[in-house]
């Protein structure tokens, strides 16, 4: 006996099920479903509701980004806080306590 899509097994005949009732409810009728137009409208309403939720989420994200943009971020280099405006920038001090070496001078670290 074959086991493919057209076999007796896939049609339910091997289990003793009448071909006319295979895959149907107890009474041999399919479960009641709303008409296609009603189901289509339900799906459309669900899609529109989800779209509104996503648009609300996007608007909230844009508002947060606007609020964050109003704040002035600190300088990326972590500049000297005590420096006065217009003063020359102070060199950064490395974690080892010394000034950073020029990467191109070839000098070895101590």
Swiss-Prot record:
PANTHER family: RGD1559909 (PTHR41401), RIKEN CDNA 1110065P20 GENE (PTHR41401:SF1). The keyword Phosphoprotein does not apply. InterPro entries: DUF4726. Signal peptide: none annotated. This is Uncharacterized protein C1orf122. Keywords: Coiled coil. Residues 36-68 form a coiled coil. It holds the Pfam family DUF4726. Residues 1-42, 66-110 are annotated as: Disordered. The lineage of its organism: Eukaryota, Metazoa, Chordata, Craniata, Vertebrata.
């Amino acid at each position: 006996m074959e086991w493919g899509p057209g076999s007796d097994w896939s049609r339910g005949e091997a289990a003793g099920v009448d071909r006319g009732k295979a895959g149907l409810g107890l009474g041999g009728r399919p479960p009641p479903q709303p008409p296609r137009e009603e189901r289509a409208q339900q799906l459309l309403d669900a899609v529109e509701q989800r779209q509104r939720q996503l648009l609300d989420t996007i608007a909230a994200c844009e508002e947060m980004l606007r609020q964050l943009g109003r704040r002035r971020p600190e300088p990326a280099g972590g500049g000297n806080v005590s420096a006065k405006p217009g003063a020359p920038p102070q060199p950064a001090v490395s974690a080892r306590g010394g000034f950073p070496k020029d990467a191109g001078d070839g000098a070895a670290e101590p």
